[in-house]
Amino acid sequence: MQGNFGREELRRNGRKQLFDDMPDLNKEQQAIFDDVVESVVNHSPSFKNVFYVDGPAGSGKTFLYRKLIHYLRSKGLIVLIVAVSGIAALLLPGGRTVHSRFRLPVPLPLEGATANITANSGTAQLLRITSLLIWDEAPNAPRAAFDAVSRCLQDVLQDLPNRSKRQPFGGLPVLFGGDFRQIR
């Protein structure tokens, strides 16, 4: 791969994490972990590819994200992490705000927002090799952000095998998480 796009993510993927030394997941976390990993490995547009984890602060969402990130990156896969706020993005390895990652306009219009990512850009190239998108604080994101990111991924990923312009988020597995009790 050429250019400087995604160097940060690729460097992170190259680091070996001591996955086995991490504490175990509980039963509910393990079920979600298994479903998400199966979706990433399966690559089938017919397999479920959109997931949501809900729980209050301290319930283990961030721990589950970290476990998934370390496991998939240890397999050489690219995992992108976004959150609505910069604070939440900083809590996860390589996390960025959804506005920054997908170049969404600020302020975000209520309808018709688009990601400012061209088909030949480095960001588009990074999205094409991404295996999983983790989106924290999802309940706090406006609908326009979901629509813009989904359209962007549908456009960028449409020519890839096992991806589909008709699928939400272009068929890329996406794990949403958050706490509906914290909606502004």
Residue ranges and their predicted role:
Residues 1-184:
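Conserved ATP-binding/catalytic motifs of P-loop helicase motor domains
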